[in-house]
């Protein structure tokens, strides 16, 4: 049985030696058997055939045969075939492997291309498709590729072999017809694996544009359909220092309303990204980080986002959203988002509620985001409205062409409940707005203590109502620019820093005195009721009543809060009129500045009239 093994070994050895001899002989004899002009003209024709343009080679070709047959060309230019002969690109050096057997037979076929310092000029048509011309082999393959049974199909006569393409230190200029802008990419390095036109493609591209390095990873089983502006499966990811983005699914590069898949976006520094793209949004500095991961699908004139996972400044949200672009109407973003924690300041900035048309550092029409309507329903376990914290919040944002409304329908605040309505007028929000706020049963004592507010302020569980408006843009309005009314009511509390008995005693012997010099006890009250009108930077108080068990404090006058000044008149009188003889009314004036008011008893001649 083993007798035939030596013979078999000899046969194998002889066969290998013959093959090796032929291989070496071909490599040695190739320079004498192959015409350099044939290979040069062959690749020149191949380039012209592929691109559909006229390829010209000015440099002297170099042919290598070891370890594989390869031709190296230099000073290549590609021009249009018409009379204008417009230059479309240049290549400093191009090398390609070729078939030795085909070259000996007088035919040249090439693969494994390497381009050194190519400089390409591309045009992106208004349809979104790159202009591949309609004459080259690539353009014909793109035009004739079709989808059958979920697969890309191409006629065999158009299905040419490619292999691998590598690009080193290239430059690409893309003229975008729709915007009229030209985008330049420098330092382009690419590695493309594409066995033949009908095969799947994988590509990695690294480039630099506007001072930023970008990396694009792309793969598709149907690249011709993708390049031709048809819908097909693809995977793409973009990475840079300013953002990372990823998409996997079915897409159409010329028609965005044909999309289905999963996408992710992460922006670690929003202001830096806006600076890079030369955009400015007032107040956006508070929105530092943003990320989004979602399933996306096209719907008529828009997109639907399901399984949304969104994060802004570390606040995470889940939900569903949709965006619509109805013909002839404003775009609209709607949806429902549930946050674990939410910062309303970041939320306002994120949705551009403070964007002003005509700002010195903004576009004159307010920008594209100004043309977006919103209809969002929001909820949060905890929400920050600096310096306050809300819990179990239900809110909504509605923005139309004429107004913007923000509502907190329900929330827990300091042991009580809070609701609010903010409304901004006009589409660019520079027509002013109004705010309505209602707080019920909140622990103002704990709030005042936590905020470390100074002065005689009511420590009690109470309710507050506020209704103010302004004609100034909301992002510019200050406290002195609003008008309206504020009211506070409370039961059973205390007013620290106001000792009624000590004030009476000091008023009998001094013409004026600092309140904090005589008030070392709190004034206990059973009812606190104060209302103030706000206008021109001042609060006007009309008959505020603070009723204690024995005495009542009545205040009226003006508080210019812009300067922290005080201009009030007041009276301390008996709560029960029947005991007035023992507690006669004491009228006084309040001046100085908050939080250190100065008391000045009214003259005796005025006490009668005041009484």
For the regions a protein language model found, what residue spans apply to each?
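Small-residue helix/turn framework positions
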Residues: 68-90, 95, 109-141, 163-173, ...
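Non-catalytic accessory/assembly modules
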Residues: 150, 155-169, 178
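N-terminal type II signal-anchor transmembrane helix
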Residues: 1-52
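Short, surface-exposed ligand-recognition loops at beta-strand->loop->(often short) alpha-helix junctions
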Residues: 34, 384-386
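Outer-membrane beta-barrel proteins
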Residues: 98-104, 150, 469-475
């Amino acid at each position: 049985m083993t007798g035939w093994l030596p013979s078999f070994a000899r046969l194998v050895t002889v066969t290998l030696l013959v093959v090796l001899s032929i291989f070496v002989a071909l490599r040695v004899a190739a320079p004498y058997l192959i015409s350099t002009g044939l290979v040069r003209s062959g690749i020149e024709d191949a380039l012209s055939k592929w691109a559909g343009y006229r390829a010209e080679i000015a440099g002297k070709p170099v042919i290598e045969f070891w370890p594989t047959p390869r031709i190296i060309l230099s000073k290549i230019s590609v021009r249009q075939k018409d009379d204008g002969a417009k230059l479309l690109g240049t290549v400093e050096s191009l090398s390609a492997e070729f078939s030795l057997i085909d070259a000996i037979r007088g035919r040249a076929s090439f693969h494994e291309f390497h381009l050194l310092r190519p400089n390409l000029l591309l045009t992106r048509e208004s349809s979104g498709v790159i202009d591949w011309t309609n004459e080259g082999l690539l353009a014909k393959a793109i035009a004739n590729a079709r989808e059958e049974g979920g697969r890309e199909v191409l006629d065999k006569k158009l299905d040419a072999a490619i292999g691998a393409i590598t690009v080193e230190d290239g430059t690409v200029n893309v003229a975008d017809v729709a915007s009229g802008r030209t985008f330049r990419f420098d330092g382009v390095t690419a590695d493309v694996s594409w066995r033949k036109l009908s095969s799947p493609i994988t590509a990695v591209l690294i480039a630099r544009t506007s001072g930023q390095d970008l990396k694009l990873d792309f793969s598709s089983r149907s690249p011709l359909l993708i390049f031709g502006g048809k819908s097909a499966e693809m995977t793409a990811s973009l990475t840079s220092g300013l953002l990372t983005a990823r998409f996997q699914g079915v897409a159409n590069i010329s028609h965005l309303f044909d999309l289905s898949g999963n996408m992710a976006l992460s922006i670690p520094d929003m202001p830096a990204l806006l600076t890079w793209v030369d955009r400015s949004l007032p107040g956006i500095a508070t929105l530092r980080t943003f990320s989004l991961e979602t399933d996306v699908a096209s719907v008529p004139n828009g997109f639907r986002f399901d399984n949304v996972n969104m994060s802004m400044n570390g606040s995470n949200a889940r939900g569903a959203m949709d965006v619509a672009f109805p013909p002839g109407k404003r775009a609209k973003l709607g949806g429902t988002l549930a946050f674990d924690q939410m910062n309303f300041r970041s939320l306002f900035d994120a949705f551009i509620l403070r964007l002003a048309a005509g700002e010195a550092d903004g576009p004159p029409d307010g920008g594209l985001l100004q043309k977006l309507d919103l209809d969002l329903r929001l909820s949060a376990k905890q929400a920050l409205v600096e310096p306050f914290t809300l819990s179990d919040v239900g809110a909504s944002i509605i923005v139309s062409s004429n107004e913007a409304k923000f509502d907190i329908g329900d929330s827990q605040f300091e042991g009580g409940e809070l609701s609010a309505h903010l409304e901004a007028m006009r589409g660019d929000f520079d027509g002013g707005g109004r705010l309505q706020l209602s707080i019920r049963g909140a622990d103002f004592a704990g709030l005042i203590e936590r905020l470390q507010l100074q002065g005689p302020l009511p420590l009690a569980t109470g309710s507050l109502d506020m209704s103010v408006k302004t004609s100034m843009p909301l992002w510019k309005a200050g406290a002195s620019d609003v008008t309206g009314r504020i009211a506070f009511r409370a039961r059973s509390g205390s007013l620290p820093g106001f000792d009624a008995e000590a004030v009476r005693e000091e008023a009998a012997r001094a013409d004026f005195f600092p309140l904090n010099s005589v008030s070392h006890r709190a004034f206990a009250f059973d009812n606190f009721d104060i209302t103030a009108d706000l206008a021109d930077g001042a609060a006007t108080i009309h008959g505020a009543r603070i009723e204690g068990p024995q005495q009542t404090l009545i205040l009226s006058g003006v508080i210019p809060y812009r300067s922290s000044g005080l201009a009030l008149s007041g009276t301390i009188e008996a709560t029960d009129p029947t005991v007035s003889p023992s507690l006669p009314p004491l009228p006084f004036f309040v001046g100085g500045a908050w939080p250190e008011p100065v008391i000045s008893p009214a003259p005796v001649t005025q006490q009668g009239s005041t009484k």
